[in-house]
């Protein structure tokens, strides 16, 4: 029995298909099948029922898979602990990140961090805040990047990363006005993210949608991503709210549709949270410091913080 065989087991259990598992493990299907068969023979247990489509993990196999995952987790922990004791920035970080941040941090700051720290491996999972909290508690991830303050994070450790302004993206006609209040909105197309997204709640708070001071005809429409919101405004007009990092990736023509709210400018706070300090703390600290430094000079909030108001994501 070896580590590779355990990894193959978990892959087949995940994909329920030998071909897909082999592809994910970067080996040929015959090699993977032979290694699993060898392990089944060694343990005298049938782990997978190959007669079903998709492949089914047997009851005994479920127990073996659970133990295999625990063994691999222990091995990863041992490696990371050794790196930590040697004061080396190396190991694996499982990171959960909310979708309205991931699309702008991953291709830029996170890639830069990993390029500068080649011995750190990062597995990134795009999740909403609720699932990040659950995954932290269960130990599935080591840390999460979310919008704070959030009521369920009181038992967590939190490392502030950055504040970013929330801006209007609109086909608003009066191009002479640079600052807009929610009372100035005159549109029956207010595009929102889907329920469960913390940025949607911030949109509702800023624009007083909960109090019905603005009641668009199609308020029930909800998008799954910021890029969809941008496309809806570009194609059909209307209004939405974008975080500042999203506006930095717009074309020059699109940037003409960006407006500030009136003071105090609404903004959101983004933090790195984790359940408890671990041997991965040095890596997490370095990662957080890198993100702070990378964004400190590029966000409006840092120019004059007293002009901004943090909007809670709930």
Regions found by a protein language model. Give the residues of each.
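Secondary-structure junction motif
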Residues: 176, 188-212, 280-282, 288, ...
């Amino acid at each position: 029995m070896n580590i590779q065989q355990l990894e193959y087991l978990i892959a087949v259990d995940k994909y329920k298909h030998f071909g897909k598992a082999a592809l994910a493990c970067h080996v040929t299907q015959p090699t993977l099948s032979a290694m699993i068969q060898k392990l089944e023979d060694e343990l005298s247990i049938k782990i997978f029922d190959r007669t079903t489509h998709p492949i089914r993990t047997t009851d005994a196999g479920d127990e073996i898979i659970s133990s295999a995952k625990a063994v691999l987790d222990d091995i990863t922990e041992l490696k990371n602990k050794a790196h930590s004791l040697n004061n080396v920035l190396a190991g694996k970080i499982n990171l959960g990140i909310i979708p309205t941040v991931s699309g702008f941090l991953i291709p830029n700051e996170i890639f830069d961090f990993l390029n500068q720290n080649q011995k750190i491996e990062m597995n990134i999972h795009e999740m909403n805040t609720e699932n990040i909290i659950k995954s932290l508690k269960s130990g599935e991830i080591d840390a999460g990047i979310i919008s704070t303050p959030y009521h369920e994070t009181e038992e967590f450790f939190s490392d502030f990363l950055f504040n970013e302004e929330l801006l209007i993206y609109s086909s608003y006609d009066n191009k002479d006005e640079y600052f807009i209040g929610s009372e100035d909105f005159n549109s029956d197309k207010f595009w929102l993210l889907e329920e469960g997204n913390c940025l949607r709640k911030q949109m509702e708070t800023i624009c007083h949608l909960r109090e019905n001071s603005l009641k668009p005809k199609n308020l029930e429409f909800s998008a799954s991503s910021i890029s969809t919101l941008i496309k809806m405004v570009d194609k059909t007009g209307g209004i939405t709210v974008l975080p500042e990092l999203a506006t930095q990736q717009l074309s020059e023509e699109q940037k003409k549709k960006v407006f500030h709210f009136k003071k105090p400018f609404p903004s959101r706070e983004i933090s790195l949270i984790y359940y408890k300090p671990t041997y991965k703390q040095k890596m997490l600290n370095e990662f957080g410091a890198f993100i702070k430094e990378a964004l400190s000079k590029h966000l409006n909030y840092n120019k004059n913080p007293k002009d901004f108001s943090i909007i809670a994501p709930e």
